[in-house]
């Protein structure tokens, strides 16, 4: 981006949805020097603990589960990684919530020093409508972090 656009690379934020939300969390936790803000919609918070994550990590990283920790947002926080305050929005009617997402586990490990705002929304699922409803809050979250000195 810095090569193509007149961007201030000292003021970057990252966000995503679902697995992209997990990517945003892990990148921010692994590279807090690169990102001043982070947010996610319905992220997979602990892929090492869910069927989809086990399949993906096993396929890409092998069966040695200790290697997965560096790519799992919950494990990164457990291992002491920190980043700027995180905003997560989660729909309570999300069909992936119970088995795949594990935001409660992420919230638990963040209680030990990682600033987190986890907002739970009844009546919302994993869809575009959910994101469209709350995207302005995420933009404001990033704007606050990126416009302060």
Label the predicted regions.
Residues 1-149:
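Non-catalytic cap/lid and distal C-terminal segments of serine-dependent acyl enzymes
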């Amino acid at each position: 981006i810095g090569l193509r656009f007149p961007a201030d690379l000292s003021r970057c934020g990252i966000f995503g949805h679902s697995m992209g939300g997990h990517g945003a969390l892990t990148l921010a936790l692994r590279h807090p020097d690169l990102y001043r803000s982070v947010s996610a919609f319905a992220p997979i918070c602990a892929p090492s603990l869910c069927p989809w994550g086990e399949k993906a990590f096993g396929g890409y990283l092998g069966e040695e589960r200790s290697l997965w920790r560096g790519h799992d947002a919950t494990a990164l926080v457990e291992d002491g990684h920190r980043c700027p305050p995180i905003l997560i929005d989660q729909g309570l009617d999300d069909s992936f919530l119970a088995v795949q997402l594990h935001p409660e586990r992420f919230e638990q490990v963040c209680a030990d020093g990682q600033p987190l705002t986890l907002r739970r929304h009844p009546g919302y699922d994993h869809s575009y409508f959910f994101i469209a409803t709350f995207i302005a809050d995420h933009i404001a979250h990033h704007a606050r972090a990126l416009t302060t000195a």
